Amino acid sequence: MPYTSNPAIITQSAGGVGYNIALAAKYAGASVLLSSIVADDLAGRSLLKQLAESELSPKGIKQLNHVDGFRTAQYVAVNDKKKDLVMAMADMAILHDSPPDISDDWQSLVSSRKPKWIVVDANWSATLLSQIISIANKEKVKVAFEPVSVQKSVRIFQPDQQIVTPESVVPRHRISLATPNVFELETMYEAAKKMALFESSEWWESINSFEMSSAGSRDKLVSITNAELVDRGIPQQAIQLLPYIPNLVVKLGDQGCLLVYLLPPGDPNLSNPASAPYILSRATNDSSIVGGLYMRHFPPAEIVRQDEIMSVNGIGDTMLGVLMAGLAKEGARVEELIPVAQQGAVRTLKSVAAVSPEVRGLKGLIGIKKRL
């Protein structure tokens, strides 16, 4: 009821998109370092204490001076009795106004630890995103991007930050993987269109290398996805973004997810009969960059009853964390990891925790047939 206090069940926990992804990846067996910033306030000190007591190390966390006006980022979600989100409030100013020397700390971390992947979420400002991604590119570390929200998803499409540019097409792409939902994908597509990214000569050269035929293309897309998604333009928009982000996992809510990615020349999927239904195009030229285009719709791992749903807040983060744990392994293939990642999401959906501890049970299901 508005304009008055209401009875509620209130719980507190360490969280945030980056924390959840890191914890899920850790549960799934990956070696993970969470890197973020907190203030020297009650929330920041509490978070560092919880990290020290958890499976995640606090060594990647930088604590800023609360006297300088910094506040540890906090997020408050209000859910209804069905556990669906009604309203949320976020204080993320610290992720926008960090001191300029923070990039030196990140550079040192990446140089010393030499990770295979850096996962970055769009809670950071466009300026800081640019710094993080530049460090990853310099160190030849692959970047996975989690858009977080419709509003924040466009932060990689800012002309003044040079993150995604007309020139940053495969193989010069700056982001290797992104995991938007359908609303974020549509917004990212429109932002790229506004930047004229689909008009550059580099984009056209890359798109033409896919050698996609317009004849029967709608029927093929419908056979892989469904008419509703095609009419909405979801697979088409994903394809047009591929030159800039060559691996997309589009979250479709209760419809599962859509995987769209570029195959390199000679990829086993191009000659595997079992993969034929998912090969949207094959390059017949002598391109050393693109061998074909793979698109596959993954239905939900499980239909979860309403009375089994505990929280919807961390399911996407859990899915990405499990996916990254697999991709960090030598030999892992993204299409084989997605069903496992979906199982992780289901376990979190049934848990009161932002990331279900039962994700640990998925360690043995992560395969070793690498593509990314």
Spans of model-derived segments:
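Glycine-rich phosphate/adenosyl-contacting loop at the front of the ribokinase-like
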Residues: 1-35, 39-53, 75, 87, ...
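Gly/Ala-rich phosphate-binding loop of Rossmann-like dinucleotide-binding domains
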Residues: 26, 137, 328
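A glycine-rich helix N-cap at a beta->alpha junction
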Residues: 50-69
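Structural recognition of alpha->loop->beta junctions
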Residues: 54-58, 156-190, 279, 283-294
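Conserved phosphate-binding/catalytic region of the ribokinase-like
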Residues: 152, 190-372
